[in-house]
C-alpha cells in the first residue's frame, strides 16, 4: 500500500485517482502544468487534496511512493522523467484502478467502435441482472467509478466494462483484464503516436 501518491494531471482521470487514493487511506497531491478548472479544484480541496497548478515543483512531486499519470500527459514529460530518476513507480489511472477493484474486468480497445461496444456490453449485462459498471474512456474515469463503488453498502461491482484507449494502455504495467476485446486497428492520432510504440505494440 502507499502512504503518499502524486497524481500528474488534474482532469477527469486525475480527480478520479485522487478519490480512490483517499478511499484507500493514502494522502495525495494533484499537480498540473496548466490551470485547474475552478469547480474541480474546489472539489479536490474540499476532500483535503493538495492541488498545484501552473507548473510542477520537482521536490514536492517526487515526495511520494507512487506517481499516477493521466493519459493526456506524454511519457516523455519532465515530471515523468523526474519520477523515474527518483526510483518512483509510474503507472496510469487505468492501472491504478485495476489494482484496487475486486470486480472482474472486460476491457474494450481498438481504433473505432469502443464506446458503442462498451455501452452495449454494459447494457446487456445489467439487463441480464449482473452488477456491472461502465467506465474508462467512455466517460467516468475508472478510478473514480471504483472509488464510488467501494462506498456502496454492497461494495465494489462484480464486473467492470472498461473502454481503454491506446493512451491509457501505454501507461499500464501489469494490467491483465479478465476479458480483452480488440476491435480493429487503423492509423489514427498519428501526430501524437508517431514517436511512440504502435497501438498494436502497446496492446501487446
Model regions: which residues?
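Charged, amphipathic alpha-helical interaction segments
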Residues: 22-23, 102, 200-201
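Single conserved hydrophobic/aromatic residue that forms the stacking wall/gate
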Residues: 194-197, 201-204
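Active-site flanking residues adjacent to catalytic metal/cofactor-binding acidic residues
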Residues: 8, 31, 136, 162, ...
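N-terminal leader/targeting and accessory segments in enzymes
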Residues: 1-92, 96
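Phosphate-binding loop of NTP-binding sites
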Residues: 59-62, 71-196
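Compositionally biased, low-complexity repeat tracts
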Residues: 50-51, 135, 199
Amino acid at each position: 500500500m502507499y502512504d503518499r501518491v502524486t497524481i500528474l494531471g488534474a482532469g477527469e482521470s486525475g480527480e478520479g485517482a485522487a478519490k480512490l487514493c483517499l478511499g484507500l487511506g493514502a494522502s495525495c497531491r494533484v499537480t498540473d502544468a496548466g490551470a485547474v478548472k475552478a469547480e474541480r479544484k474546489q472539489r479536490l480541496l474540499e476532500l483535503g487534496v493538495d492541488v498545484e497548478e501552473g507548473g510542477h515543483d520537482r521536490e514536492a512531486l517526487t515526495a511520494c511512493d507512487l506517481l499516477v499519470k493521466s493519459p493526456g500527459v506524454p511519457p516523455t514529460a519532465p515530471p515523468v522523467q523526474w519520477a523515474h530518476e527518483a526510483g518512483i513507480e509510474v503507472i496510469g489511472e487505468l492501472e491504478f484502478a485495476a489494482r484496487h477493484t475486486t470486480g472482474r474486468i472486460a476491457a474494450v480497445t481498438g481504433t473505432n467502435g469502443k464506446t458503442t461496444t462498451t455501452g452495449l456490453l454494459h447494457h446487456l449485462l445489467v439487463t441480464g441482472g449482473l452488477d456491472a459498471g461502465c467506465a474508462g474512456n467512455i466517460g467516468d474515469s475508472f478510478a473514480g467509478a471504483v472509488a464510488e463503488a467501494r462506498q456502496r453498502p454492497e461494495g465494489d461491482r462484480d464486473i467492470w466494462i472498461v473502454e481503454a484507449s491506446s493512451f491509457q494502455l501505454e501507461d499500464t504495467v501489469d494490467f491483465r483484464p479478465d476479458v480483452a476485446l480488440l476491435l480493429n486497428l487503423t492509423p489514427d492520432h498519428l501526430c501524437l503516436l508517431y514517436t511512440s510504440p504502435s497501438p498494436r505494440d502497446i496492446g501487446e
